[in-house]
């Protein structure tokens, strides 16, 4: 996890990097279908919404759910967005002291 953004546009040009987890092209039945397990989406959204680098973009279907695919909104996504809007400011400090734990403020 500590190298998730290493050698990426997010690292090199964060002001130009729009980060997203899913979009209308990647949902089931679409041309670029990719499967991201529902249990992992809150973790993935945490990484793009709570970190300083990049411009996060939240997929409508993850926020409101996708009725035709019987998919519910992502648990705690609204809370993550609220946390970002209220508390995400100032320079970020990473704490990568342990190989299995990622921390940042």
Segments (PLM) and residue ranges:
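Active-site-proximal helices and loops of the catalytic beta/alpha 8
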Residues: 1-105
